Swiss-Prot record:
Coiled coil: none annotated. Belongs to the DNA mismatch repair MutL/HexB family. GO terms for biological process: mismatch repair. Pfam families: DNA_mis_repair, HATPase_c_3, MutL_C. Keywords: DNA damage, DNA repair. InterPro entries: DNA_mismatch_repair_CS (IPR014762), DNA_mismatch_repair_MutL (IPR020667), DNA_mismatch_S5_2-like (IPR013507), HATPase_C_sf (IPR036890), MutL/Mlh/PMS (IPR002099), MutL/Mlh/Pms-like (IPR038973), MutL_C (IPR014790), MutL_C_dimsub (IPR042120). Residues 377-389 have a biased composition (Polar residues). This is DNA mismatch repair protein MutL. It comes from Yersinia enterocolitica serotype O:8 / biotype 1B (strain NCTC 13174 / 8081).
Amino acid sequence: MPIQILPPQLANQIAAGEVVERPASVVKELVENSLDAGASRIDIDIERGGAKLIRIRDNGCGIGKDDLALALARHATSKISSLEDLEAILSMGFRGEALASISSVSRLILTSRTAEQNEAWQAYAEGRDMAVTIKPAAHPVGSTLEVLDLFYNTPARRKFMRTEKTEFGHIDEVVRRIALARFDVAINLSHNGKLMRQYRAAPDPSQHERRLASICGPAFLQHALAISWQHGDLTIRGWVADPAASRTLSEMQYCYVNNRMMRDRLINHAIRQAYQDLLKDDQQPAYVLYLDIDPHQVDVNVHPAKHEVRFHQARLVHDFIYQAVTTVLQQTATPLLNINEDGEEIEAPRWQPENRVAAGANKYAQPEPANTVPVVRTSSPERTATTERSIARERTPTYHAGEPYQKQQGELYRQLVQPAAVNKPAAVSQPSAASAPVARQISTDEPLHGDNYSFGRVLTVFPPCYALIEYKQGIALLELTVAERWLKQAQLNPPAEGLRPQPLLIPLKLTLDKNEATACQRHQKLLATMGIELAVEHTRATLRAVSLPLRQQNLQKLIPELLGYLSQHEEISPDALATWISRHLGSEHEVWNVSQAIQLLTDVERLCPQLVKSPPAGLLQPIDIKAALATLTHE
């Protein structure tokens, strides 16, 4: 068979295979078009589960007569006109395929009128070439789309449709998701002439809980914990159910990105990880969450039905969601009870979001003092739903960042998961070739401030790891891998509260021998101080989190070596352990460039100013310029 161009109807039917899966898909596409048209009221009429009729009526801006024919054509849209528009999508639709695809597998009639027109017009496509016919009609300002006899000309697709009840159930779920996304729009859903759902508009934030209760039910609202976090251009808001209620509300999982309903695996993983110690493996969390992000930082054009997105900074988004949900759950969780040596019950310590000195003398993002509310406990289990919600709202912390989102430099990510420097750096331990129980420390007579000490300007880098720098009115060679090891050790020296663990995207499973498992259990507190969360069961271990300096390391190799080292010591200090780890970390760069060298030295000068004043052996080698000049001048 020779290559030939497909007829328009066949091409549209092929495209419909991706967009129009069932009647619920048609409802989703058409209602999203109504939302893009600025409608404040949408009426949805369904007959026989959508197989016989789907009618969507809205009071949006309408479509002009001259645009009606194009509205049913493929790749025709008013949403975008350039690649720049595609990279910053805010509208629900943008491909211009939905109406053409739907009209190719049904009898579609589009009636519309704009405020500027005196009369309405009706359009429908028919025939092998999908020719569009336009005629006058009576209609108020807005649009009505009628989809009759869905899949009438594709018997194979119609055969796979389920029962009327099942198909309407899917439509009901789609409408529920859309109603949760747009509180300001009134939506009515009817089936076979009977009004099934009536979601009244709730434009005022104080009315949102009423809409939430009508969609998710009073049981979810009673156990809902309000959440509202902001960091730069990232904002997350909504509700999460407390763990006790999540066990019976697991079907309530709604997530939106820029008001677009999503089933994104990264977001689901972050939420699930926040609940991981509060739910069993077969239980699921319940939540209604809205993530707002700069549209330039998310790609929505990666799924035919736009159910999934791709984030440019996936790790940032994952950790941001995890931290937000974890904080709310920790603040509202019931304290666990431990038994002390005297047999008395004592309250276990609970993690609280706080500003603390962490790895490398840094701080976590500062919350506004006005939003800091102490945790409220009550011994009475009979609190009303209103009281629960008001307390949850008061407890909800909102974090702000002063600098805008930086895609290239990842500045926001470092602010989120890495704390900011303080003026007085901690003393740095001297690396030693021998694994000494206690590392020797460099001391200074007076406090050092990073702003007053600098190695000098980086001139160039000699591969693989030597930087030529200006140094004390001359030049010197600096070994970057040695400087990197000093920096890692400074970041690994734990403060009194310990290093902050950063959850792994995928927990690491390890198989340990008997000595390693014993060492892990014996030094569990020490590992926690280093920000390492390692759960051991017999000879199996699960690594769930590590401190920030270890995030980019080969943990599959490093952790067993670390446990082997710990098995040789009954007791060991955190400083000695930090020294050992820093000497066994791999370099982040095989071959360094100038920008990487500048960034490294900037961090070293900030966290380890002692190295500038008294460089240790192996770090810096001054170059005798006078001897070189004497050779050139034959002196």
